[in-house]
A protein has these predicted regions:
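Extreme N-terminal starter segment of soluble prokaryotic enzymes
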Residues: 1-3
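Two-component/phosphorelay signaling modules centered on CheY-like receiver
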Residues: 17-25
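Short hydrophobic/Thr-rich beta-strand motif most characteristic of the beta2 strand and flanking loop
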Residues: 25-31
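Short amphipathic alpha-helix with an adjacent loop that forms part of the alpha/beta core around
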Residues: 35-43
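Cysteine-nucleophile active-site neighborhood
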Residues: 42-116, 179-181
Length: 189
């Protein structure tokens, strides 16, 4: 079962739908409806932290989820705000950026993990006004870049990934394949 942390964003249920279409059983919980400790006891196979309209500090349990679930060995994916929450959880910085909403960008990636088997460059849909500072802490590595912005990060030792773009958007034609790669990652199931 997949836990989706809902950061009060309209894209959350696009993620839920895509994951369901890929055969996953999905349960969404608002970022202020339960504690991370309560959710850690839920027997989740994977966790996705959704996009949202705020900063990571304002996103309820999102930053804590992006740290504690991977530390428990549970594969975790952050999308947009979730990606920023991952960076912040491990000592990275989130900075303001010129707003980009409903635009496509070509990104280049490392071809591993989430990006395995996907074309590079890859067309992705962007909706954000915050980004992860590329000066990352040692625990994190950049897996994708586009338009001068960090578009993907991964923890070097834990099963934690983040993407700045929206794989659940129609503007990301290969988004469902990326989510399939996340579901295929070895985990606790």
């Amino acid at each position: 079962m997949i836990l989706v942390i809902d950061n009060y964003d309209s894209f959350t249920y696009n993620l839920v739908q895509y994951l369901g279409e890929l055969g996953a059983e999905v349960h969404a919980v608002r970022n202020d409806a339960a504690s991370t400790g309560e959710l850690l006891d839920g027997g989740w196979d994977r966790v996705v932290v959704s996009p949202g309209p705020c900063t990571p500090r304002e996103a309820g349990i999102s930053v804590e989820v992006m740290r504690r679930f991977p530390e428990a060995g549970i594969p975790t994916l952050g999308v947009c705000l979730g990606h920023q929450s991952l960076a912040q959880a491990f000592g990275g910085t989130v900075i303001r950026h010129e707003p980009v909403h409903g635009k496509t960008t070509e990104i280049t990636h490392d071809g591993t993990g989430l990006f395995e088997g996907l074309p590079s460059p890859l067309t992705v849909g962007r909706y954000h006004s915050l980004v992860v500072d590329p000066d990352l802490p040692d625990a994190l590595m950049i897996t994708a870049m586009g338009g001068g912005v960090v578009m993907g990060v991964q923890h070097r030792e834990l099963p934690a990934h983040g993407v700045q773009f929206h794989p659940e958007s129609v503007l990301t034609p290969e988004g469902k394949r990326l989510l399939r790669n996340f579901l295929a990652e070895p985990g606790t199931d």
